[in-house]
Amino acid sequence: MTEPNPTNHILPKKRVVVALTGATGIIYGIRLLEVLQTMPDVESHAVISPAAKRTLVEETDATVKQVEALADVVYDYRDIGAALASGSFHTHAMVIVPCSIKTMASLALSFADNLITRAGDVTLKEGRP
């Protein structure tokens, strides 16, 4: 009888949610997506708010399409029915960078009116980092 080889198992990738909002410092969110792209054990999921898209144009030379291309999966900011909005969609972590004051206040008050705040609310509820 042969022993199972633990190296034959393909471990699922760690899902990391990166949300970019309209605060200044969009370069930090872009850099995080660039770093995650180099990590073979990570699957990045991105949500970019309309204000972040505007900030992106004002603060960088990058386009929205270029930033979206850094993520494995991109979600529409308005789609509160997306997988990220469910606690049954397991993620390893969520990072909101940059995080606007509006987004921070929405999370503090559980005011989930878009996918970023809904996913953040779920992440907090589930006790995930």
Regions found by a protein language model. Give the residues of each.
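A cross-family phosphate/adenosyl-ligand binding-site feature
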Residues: T2-P129
